[in-house]
């Protein structure tokens, strides 16, 4: 009797196992196939960081910022503000490579920046008296004198657009009614953000330059944080963030070829929309 029961149980198990095969097969067939990963400018779509994707800005389309340049603190963020400035002020920390747009609720929007050689000479307080969309660029007399081989080919200037070293936006800083020739601006050199560059003033990712530009009005105060304050507020590690980057040689033929192609598509541009206090 026990043998009969055991045999019957075995047959039942076998029968149930057979019945389960089509069900399992049907379940397996119902699993959707994954689509191939999509890429944007060589970046996997799934890795594009929110706020730094493709950005259509008027006639121009900005590429996404590669995620390797947005690691850790090197991206835009709303953070508690622990500095000493009042709401509505821009505070630049050239040591920790941050720019703060101070809010009224004890918070600030913190942007990562790069600080060029000219920017390292900034100190004290200035005021934004001019804002330009897609600004053109001309090297200063000091730049031409200091490194004629690099800047000489650009003495005639580069019109506003994707090829301009000032990027998508520029904020022009004045003191006592006079242009200081210091700028807060975008950049095409995304790898420089978070570091010290060989040239330029205060650089931002173009996405961040546009974001800041749209927030700050003309007349905004801009204050540069001292190294001592940077250490007190950020800590010694962040106050010494980044590395000194070597000079980057840019082929003028490539730049002006890009300008010619841009002019063929959009017409001859110099500066885009200009807002200024006169």
Model-identified regions with their sequence ranges:
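N-terminal pre-domains immediately preceding structured catalytic cores
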Residues: 2-12, 20-202, 206-278
């Amino acid at each position: 009797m026990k043998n009969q029961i055991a045999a019957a149980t075995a047959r039942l198990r076998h029968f149930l196992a057979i019945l389960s095969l089509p069900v399992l097969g049907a379940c397996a067939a119902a699993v959707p196939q994954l689509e191939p990963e999509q890429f944007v400018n060589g970046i996997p779509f799934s890795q594009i960081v929110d706020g730094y994707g493709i950005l259509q800005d008027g006639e121009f389309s900005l590429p996404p910022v590669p995620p390797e340049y947005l690691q850790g603190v090197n991206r835009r963020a709303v953070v508690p503000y622990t500095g000493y400035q009042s709401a509505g002020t821009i505070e630049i920390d050239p040591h920790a490579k941050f720019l703060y747009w101070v809010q009224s609720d004890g918070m600030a929007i913190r942007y990562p920046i790069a600080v060029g050689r000219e920017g390292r000479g900034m100190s004290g307080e200035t005021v934004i008296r001019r804002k330009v969309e897609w600004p053109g660029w001309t090297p200063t007399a000091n730049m031409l004198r200091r490194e004629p081989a690099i800047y000489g080919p650009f003495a005639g200037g580069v019109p506003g657009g994707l090829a301009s070293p000032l990027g998508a936006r520029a904020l022009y800083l004045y003191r006592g009614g006079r242009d200081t020739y210091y700028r807060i601006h975008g950049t095409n050199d995304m790898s420089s953000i978070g570091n010290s560059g060989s040239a330029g003033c205060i650089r931002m990712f173009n996405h961040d330059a546009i974001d800041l530009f749209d927030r700050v009005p003309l007349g905004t105060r801009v204050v540069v944080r001292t190294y001592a304050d940077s250490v007190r507020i950020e800590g010694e590690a962040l106050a010494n963030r980044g590395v000194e980057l070597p000079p980057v040689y840019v082929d003028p033929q490539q730049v002006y070829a890009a300008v010619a192609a841009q002019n063929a598509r959009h017409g001859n541009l110099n500066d885009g929309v200009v807002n200024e206090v006169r």
